[in-house]
């Protein structure tokens, strides 16, 4: 029994050491940062298996200036590239949005834009929600962004007052608490390209993309993504659609087009962007006269 306890203690310490090692690797990685007005773009290529014993490519938008910029949700009834939705709305930045039906194109989780309900959570999606796999809702007004813990009551979002809402899954962090993630789901445990949104305690909004399915970018499990969101200082964090949908777009000084490595074409380049149903945009606010 004493030997067994010692082994368990050793394994626990080893896991903790590895977690500390990953957090240090993340913080001390070769991050490149560029500030444009109130928007910051960060990117990092982790090589030689330096993060989670794997190669990773991560990109982050940080939005802290709500005087000049605002978050905006976009939707098209026919699948459209995130970059094209961004261009149509003259967005300066964008990532892909929430989940959708690949064949019939419609959102499979609640979506409201400019007060109009455009998508309802399907019965199939509703069955997935549990105490260990909570849904979350990104709520957007002109001056504020919130991440809400979705109630299990069907179509709960429809009664909320926010003009723009996008439900996604799962909720990773809420009010500073790392939420449990259902361990028997491949979607949780397997590594994929990931897209997520987070909010820090000071109101800074983060849009995060993790590339995957390539030797230089392994992708992350949701538990790994959850750790990354915590290391980025998120008080609240929500996973969005990922895989081949994952896209990071820019139209700012010296940075134009898709900057990550979408995987739908099977190559590690910028040309594999998938058409999607919806997206999260960053737009410039109209100047007040």
Q: What are the roles of these predicted feature ranges?
A:
Residues 63, 94-99, 209-212, 240-243:
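Active-site-proximal beta-strand/loop segments in catalytic clefts of secreted hydrolases
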Residues 15-19:
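Sec/Tat signal peptide C-region and signal peptidase I cleavage site
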Residues 160-184:
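Short, conserved active-site entrance elements at the starts or edges of catalytic domains
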Residues 105-126, 183-199, 206-232, 245-289:
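Conserved, well-ordered active-site substructure
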Residues 20-131, 135-137, 146-147:
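Zymogen propeptides
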Residues 92-96, 137-139, 146-147, 198, ...:
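Structural recognition of the beta-strand scaffold that forms the well-ordered cores
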Residues 73-79, 152-157, 210-214:
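Short, solvent-exposed aromatic-acidic interface loops
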Residues 4-13:
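Sec-dependent N-terminal signal peptides
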């Amino acid at each position: 029994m004493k030997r067994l306890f010692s082994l368990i203690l050793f394994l626990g310490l080893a896991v903790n050491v590895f977690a500390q090692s990953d957090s240090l690797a993340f913080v001390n990685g070769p991050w490149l940062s560029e500030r444009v007005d109130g928007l910051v773009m960060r990117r990092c290529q982790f090589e030689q298996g330096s993060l989670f014993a794997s190669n990773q490519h991560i990109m982050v938008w940080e939005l802290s200036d709500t005087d000049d910029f605002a978050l905006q949700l976009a939707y098209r009834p026919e699948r459209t590239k995130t970059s094209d939705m961004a261009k149509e709305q003259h967005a300066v930045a964008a990532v892909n949005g929430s989940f959708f039906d690949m064949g019939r194109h419609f959102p499979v989780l609640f979506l409201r834009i400019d007060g109009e309900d455009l998508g309802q959570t399907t019965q199939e999606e509703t069955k997935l929600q549990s105490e260990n796999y909570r849904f979350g809702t990104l709520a957007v007004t002109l001056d504020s962004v919130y991440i809400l813990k979705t109630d299990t009551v069907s179509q709960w979002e429809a009664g909320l007052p926010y003009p723009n809402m996008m439900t996604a899954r799962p909720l990773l962090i809420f009010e500073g608490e790392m939420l449990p993630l259902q361990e028997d789901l491949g979607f949780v445990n397997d590594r994929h390209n990931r897209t997520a949104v987070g909010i820090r305690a000071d109101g800074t909004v983060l849009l995060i993309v993790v590339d995957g399915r390539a030797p230089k970018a392994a992708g992350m499990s949701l538990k790994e993504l959850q750790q990354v969101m915590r290391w980025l200082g998120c008080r609240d964090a929500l996973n969005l659609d990922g895989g081949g949908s994952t896209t990071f777009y820019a139209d700012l000084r010296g940075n134009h087009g898709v900057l990550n490595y979408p995987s739908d074409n099977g190559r590690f380049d910028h040309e594999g962007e998938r058409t999607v149903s919806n997206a999260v945009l960053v737009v410039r606010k109209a100047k007040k006269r």
